[in-house]
Amino acid sequence: MIRADLYLQRIDFLRYLPGSDCRECGASSCAGLIRGLKDGTLSPSDCPSLPDHRVAAFSFALRAREILPVVPAFELPRPGYPGLVEINNPVGDSPVLVSGNSQFTQEVVTTILGFTVSPFRILFVDCRGDTVDMAMLYQSLTVDRIYRALAGTEPPGSGKVMELILPGFARELERPLIEKTGWSVQVGPICVAELPLFLGERWRMAEGW
């Protein structure tokens, strides 16, 4: 079986390193630190400036290959159910993670979210079952589709959706989505395994991490 590319190599570890000198972590440079983390000769806990939540997020991302499900590379779309899914009892201002409705994308995203106790909503937009990278290529993930998907899913008591987090491949939709909705929109990482790093203290790891 040919495995789908989950873009683990696109995780931007450098972005989340402490602003201090990486030599405090036992490496000669920050690039050397990342190499050491990836080959296992260094550990996130070697960095005294990294807070506990970031140590856990680094450890998680570094182990993503063994955590994520094996997904086959299919040429044809495999549509799953679109719609809004709630994780960990979200409240009115809990962020909404936007994704596509590929069955395999849904499996990967929900696997990652199984490792947090933080509240989120996930909006699986009907993009004909394309994975997000293909949905942007084929223009099946659009501002209008996201807007229509959200139209009937307003969080109770909030009056409006406060914050959307787009997948990294959908960066070009950020500005037009803000202009159309007036909502707060952020562009998240390309690889979903980077979410714990990207969200920082807003991502609380489940027990054991």
Q: How would you label these PLM feature ranges?
A:
Residues 1-4, 20, 24-178, 182-209:
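Conserved mixed alpha/beta catalytic, RNA-binding, or beta-rich assembly cores of soluble enzyme
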Residues 7-23:
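Immediate flanking context of iron-sulfur cluster ligation sites
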